[in-house]
């Protein structure tokens, strides 16, 4: 690595809206404010909702399904 061209790493705090505070190393140099983190994200907490796209797929196939068939 070339000396003198790389940014300095500093320990900063990343604060989530749920109140979780995470200490990370970053080149940003100032505290971060997060919307979601691993403690409150629906995927990690198990509260994720499955979107039912079956209606959209059926509607698409109904409109364009016959175009590919000969």
UniProtKB/Swiss-Prot annotation:
Necessary cofactors: Zn(2+)
Any one GO molecular-function label of the UniProt entry: rRNA binding
Cofactor: binding details: Binds 1 zinc ion per subunit.
Single biological process term from Gene Ontology: translation
UniProt xrefs under InterPro entries: Ribosomal_bL28/bL31-like_sf, Ribosomal_bL31, Ribosomal_bL31_A, Ribosomal_bL31_sf
Keyword terms of this UniProt record: Metal-binding, Ribonucleoprotein, Ribosomal protein, RNA-binding, rRNA-binding, Zinc
Function as written in the Swiss-Prot or TrEMBL entry: Binds the 23S rRNA.
HAMAP family, A to Z: Ribosomal_bL31_1
Subunit structure: Part of the 50S ribosomal subunit.
Protein name: Large ribosomal subunit protein bL31
Organism in which the protein naturally occurs: Shewanella loihica (strain ATCC BAA-1088 / PV-4)
